Swiss-Prot record:
Alphabetical keyword list: Cytoplasm, NAD, Oxidoreductase, Pyridoxine biosynthesis
Species of origin: Pseudomonas aeruginosa (strain LESB58)
Entries under Gene3D superfamilies matching the protein: 3.30.1370.170, NAD(P)-binding Rossmann-like Domain
Pfam families noted in UniProt: 2-Hacid_dh, 2-Hacid_dh_C, DUF3410
Domain of life: Bacteria
EC annotation from Swiss-Prot or TrEMBL: 1.1.1.290
Subcellular location, principal: cytoplasm
One CC-aspect GO term: cytosol
Top-level class of the enzyme under EC nomenclature: oxidoreductase
Subcellular location: Cytoplasm
UniProt family annotation: Belongs to the D-isomer specific 2-hydroxyacid dehydrogenase family. PdxB subfamily.
Record-given protein name: Erythronate-4-phosphate dehydrogenase
Active site: R208, E237, H254
Amino acid sequence: MRILADENIPVVDAFFADQGSIRRLPGRAIDRAALAEVDVLLVRSVTEVSRAALAGSPVRFVGTCTIGTDHLDLDYFAEAGIAWSSAPGCNARGVVDYVLGCLLAMAEVRGADLAERTYGVVGAGQVGGRLVEVLRGLGWKVLVCDPPRQAREPDGEFVSLERLLAEADVISLHTPLNRDGEHPTRHLLDEPRLAALRPGTWLVNASRGAVVDNQALRRLLEGGADLEVALDVWEGEPQADPELAARCLIATPHIAGYSLEGKLRGTAQIYQAYCAWRGIAERVSLQDVLPETWLAGLQLNPGCDPVWALATLCRAVYDPRSDDAAFRRSLTGDSATRRAAFDALRKHYPPRREITGLRVATGGRVELQRVVRALGAQLV
């Protein structure tokens, strides 16, 4: 097999070395010419895999190490008989960790009690569903809007987007980017909906940039709107709007899901799909390539404050403010310089682990055990 992989996909050799020759390119450089002699294509969300790129090529399998598939022309895949796989849920936990870090930062700036907020989660799939589980596990009030899932689960606890926007203090977006169809999500938060947000609302977008009208949001913030905003995704990536970023509390270069576990899990999942397509046995597993957790164990004093414990456990693993600082330093120079810096921050992103790898002792205190279990860490 002739395999072409995005150069930023990790451990490709570990999984695919015995399957043929492997060539690597920057994801944005993968085009029609690059696919002339390729059987298997492995990509991330930065590569548009379209009819124009694939027509006449020998590509027969496409794997994307991402949850979303809006960069894949699935209609053409079906027409051309091209097998494909995404990696659903691969980085979901990393995104949840990111959102928790943003909430902690917002609470610190606002002097707010996280337990007193009402959370609105828009999109309850792989990422949003896990976030809902964590927030409810902590005992917090959560409203969920997911029309496609509501249609499948009519007895589920769902609310309309209008009700969620009217009642939630915190809004976290986790929808795919659908430009048409029954439930389009492009500019789901458009200018009228953004303008109608309650004063003091916190908004987090770690889904796709165009789910929020970036220009409308910038105008709103420039006008002094009382909002706290965390954006990991941007319209026109890798060109992020520096004026919008300057008005966000947290601004990062599409790295919410960039945990080490998430990256390796994504490669493992497309390898599993590839083996199923080929009808061959899997020779490598995620556990073969995943290093030991970096924190062997944490001991909480049974008398500590549960809110402090929550913040400490989350920040022991990840604090998005470090990524925010690095991103802001990159938002200088001309547009070409900023685009290159955006991609460089993603390419050279430092390893980060997930909260689920923590092993935590609580001395038997029930309130602390609840925090540990809600976060998905291991209780010892």
